[in-house]
Every structure is written in structure tokens, then in C-alpha cells.
Amino acid sequence: MSCVDLQLRGPTACVDEVIDLVLAATQRCGSTMILEDMRNAHVFGVPEEYFIPWYKSEKIVHIERELNSIVRKSKGENGFSSVKIMADQLQCIERKLIESSAIGATQFLPNVAQLFKDSKWIYIKRNDTLRQAISRHMSTETKVNHATQNKDDNHFAGNLLQGYSSSYNRDARYDFQKIKRHCQNIVLENIVWSNFFSVNSIRPLVLSYEDLCAQGNCDYLNLISRHAGVDFSVEEDSFPRRRMVKLSNQKNDK
């Protein structure tokens, strides 16, 4: 059993086990689709956005206990664990971790890097920034982030529409200034990830949402398995179907 030491405001915290895989993402980049495929494979742990509560840092008091809880929840039956982190969560996580004296002052997000120093990384990108920005705007307008194909489909995603309807965003209004701000935020968030990887000498596996959609299958999981050192190969004939469907429709394209 391995252990990650963090210098906190009290005794040294020891995270019982390393999180094996971290998925780096930005909001509405298509990462939930990838998480569903990974969960369906049953070898990549139980990836989820476990750091959402850290947005409200006053709720996170016992760091060691919180981190060990995340490790336990993110672990699959084979002992492999994985989490997803959004770019805008990085500073929230960093603020809750006290800098180690061994970390150079010039390092970018040093405590996050220290926490995941033994983890493998995947960077999920969406090439079309404008479509990603429109997707963010639509989710704000409709309060819907994800949808399933059928009403009786269960899914782990939040803000879920069970049973997709193309009229879900019928009353949504376009706002050029808001979409422009979303575009700017997406660019900045991707810069944050690029800087984090560069400064901390991390070489992630990069996945493009558009490429995966064009591929039309789950063969990309073989890339993830090789990157993460997991014994797995996709068998398309028997691999579970996705319950989640695209929200994008003609209104998004106007």
C-alpha cells in the first residue's frame, strides 16, 4: 500500500492509497461520455467529479479524511481508482492543501501536483471552443447538463434529463455576451491545464471529444488501458451501450 504525504497545518496527512488515474477536463468538454464508457469497462475504477464539494472550502475541514474518502469512492473491484477534475476546481483544491517545504516556490499548483505525483493523467479537450461555449450557455439556460435516451435509464450524471426531447431547450435564449465570456473562460481554463502539465513535467494522454465522436466506437479505451497500465481490451460486440445521448440540436447550430 502506497502513501502520499502532504504537509498540513497539523500532523502530516497520509492519503492511504494513490489515485491511479486523473482525468483533466473543462466544463462541457464531453468528459461525462468518457466517464460512462470507463465505468462500463469495469476496470478503470469509478471516475466522478469528487472534488465538487471543495468549491465551498469551508465545508472541507478534515483534509486527510476527505481525500481517503475520495480514494475509496473512486476505486473499482480490481482496486483501480480514478477521478475527474475540472480546471476551475484546481485553485479550490490547492487552497486546501498547504505547501510542502520540499516544493519550489516557482511551481504552479504545487500541492495538487504533489497529491497526484504518482497518478497517470488524461487530458480531455474539445476542439470547437464556440460549440463548447454554446453548450455551457444552454446548460445554464435550461438547467440540464445531460440526458439519457430513455426515461427509465439510470445514470450517474447530475442535472439529468431522463428521456431526451429535442424541445428541451425550446425556450432558451441566446446571449452573445454570455457566450463570448464562456469562450474566454474555456481558453483560460485550457491554458491553466497546459501550464500545470508543463511546469510539473506531466505528460497526459490527450483525448479530443470530436475525434472520439467521429470514431463512433469505444476503441479509445484501449489507449487508456495502455496509458494506465490496465489489462483490458474492448470487445465491441458485447460492450454496454451508452445510456447518455447528445443534447446538441438544431437550436445549438443556429
Language model: regions and residue ranges:
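PAPS-dependent sulfotransferase catalytic core
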Residues: 1-87, 243
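C-terminal accessory extensions appended to soluble enzyme cores
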Residues: 1-8, 230-254
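Alpha-helix termini
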Residues: 43-44, 141, 214, 242
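Residue-level "edge-of-site" marker
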Residues: 51-52, 210, 237-240
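Short secondary-structure transition/capping segments
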Residues: 58-59, 217-218, 245-247
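Short low-complexity, flexible loop/linker segments enriched in glycine and/or proline
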Residues: 61-63, 221-223, 249-250
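PAPS-dependent sulfotransferase catalytic domain
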Residues: 86-199, 204, 212-233
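Hydrophobic residues at beta-strand termini and immediately following loops
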Residues: 207
